[in-house]
Amino acid sequence: MIKASLFAAGLCSVLASTVSAGMIAQWDFQTTTTGGTALAAAPATQKLFVANFGAGSLYLDGTNGSSDFFEPATGTTSTEINGFGGTTLNATGGMSTVTTGIAALAVVGGAASVPAGTFGANGKAMVFKFSMSGLSNLSVSYAVQRTASGFTTQQWDYSTDGTNWSSAATITGIGLSFAGGTTNVASTLGVASGLNNAATAYMRVTFTGATSATGNNRMDNFQFNADAVPAPGAIALIGVAGLVARRRR
């Protein structure tokens, strides 16, 4: 009975290791050793960021369901994207912990528009594209701060085609600094099962609530993680383990 129990326990342990959480993609906006994009300040801020770790892309160029964020040819007047100093918050593994220089992506209010008191980037969205093939239970975490006149709300939505979207989470109460422990500085959201095993998955972030041209949200150290979906054979082995344990009692 003891041997059977040990066998069952060992088998379950092996199977559990096959469905443990794993990294899909990470953006620290600095590391280039694995082919990722290093963030530049305006007017050279990129509109496409290849993940610094794992596999995925972040779009701010009007493709894949994203908005085309404005950036001037010279200077920073009315820019809607920029780069600023970052944080170590939510940086794990090989992610960069350098916080000086250009380390955090900023979405900025942009030019004043009609009606009075509104700004160009309000209502615009950036989109992450990645694969959930063989994966389930997506979790997204990141560090975020806002300036006093920066965006007050980030609406997260998900899609499997980049056209039809479902709500995932609404982030409010964004802190005015990256200081650890501040409400919503590190925001973690679990996404509904709609992306489970999707060959192509999209996460869209829409920004609203900016009240000045330079008000912004600064974001750093995005992590996309998920669980491996057990293969049919692994599920069958779980049943075998349970049956063995019952018969030996």
What are these regions (language model features)?
Residues 156-159:
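Conserved Ser/Thr-centered positions that define the repeating blades of beta-propeller domains
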Residues 244-249:
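C-terminal membrane-anchoring or membrane-association module
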Residues 26-40, 51-52, 147-151, 165-228:
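Terminal, low-complexity interaction segments
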Residues 57-133:
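Surface-exposed, low-complexity/disordered Ser/Thr/Gly/Pro/Asn-rich loops and linkers
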Residues 2-8, 12-23, 222-243:
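Short, threonine-centered small-residue motifs that mark membrane-proximal processing/anchoring sites
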Residues 132-141, 198:
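Extended extracellular/luminal ectodomain segments enriched in beta-structured repeat modules
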Residues 21-78:
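Extracellular carbohydrate-recognition regions
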